[in-house]
Amino acid sequence: MDSIIFDVDGTLWDSTEICAKAWTDVIHRETSLSLTINASTLKGLFGRLLPDIASVLFADYPKEEQLRLIDRCCQEEHKALLAQCAPLYPDLEKTLQQLKENYRLFIVSNCQAGYIEVFLETSGLGSYFEGHLCPGDTGNAKADNICKIIQEYHLKAPVYVGIH
C-alpha cells in the first residue's frame, strides 16, 4: 500500500445536517413542494451522482428543472458549509497526520465541483491531501476518477476508504 484515497461524506465529515437545512430552504423558496430534507434522507442519497439525486427528489419536474434545482441546492450548501464547518469525525486530523507520514493521501467523491474545496477550506486539512477529483470536475463517476488519480499520480498500490 502506497496511498489512500478517501471519500468525503461519511468518511471525513458529516455534512448532512447543514446540507439538509440548505436544501430544504431552496426547496421551500423555489418550488411548490412541501418536501423537508433531513440528514437521514441525505445519508441515503449521498454517494450517488447529482443528476440521480435530483431525479429522486424532484421526480415531478422536467429533467432540466431537476438539474437547476439540484444546482441551487449545491450553491446554498456551499454557502452554509463555508459559514459553518460540518462536524469532522473524531481524531481526524491526528489520524491524517499519522497516515501522511507513510502514505500519500487523496480525495475522490461523487460530489459537485467545489465541494471538496469547501471541505478542505473549512476543515483546515488541505495540507494533508495531494489531490482530489469529483464528477463536477471531470464529468466522470467515482470509479473513473479513482483510476484517473491513480494514473496521474503514478500510484502503485492505493486503497480506497469510503462508505460507497
Give the positions of each predicted feature.
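N-terminal helical cap/lid subdomain that shapes the substrate entry/recognition surface
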Residues: 2-93
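Short, acidic loop-to-helix structural element flanking the phosphoryl-transfer center
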Residues: 79-107, 117, 143-144
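Conserved Lys-Pro-Asp/Glu-containing loop-to-beta segment of HAD-superfamily phosphomonoesterases
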Residues: 3, 142-164
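A short, structured active-site edge motif that brings together acidic residues
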Residues: 41-42, 125-140
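Hydrophobic packing residues within well-ordered alpha-helices of enzyme cores
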Residues: 23, 54, 92, 116-120, ...
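Conserved phosphate-coupling serine/threonine residues in phosphotransfer and NTP-handling enzymes
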Residues: 11, 109-111
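A structural signal for isolated positions on well-ordered beta-strands in alpha/beta enzyme cores
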Residues: 104-106, 131, 159-161
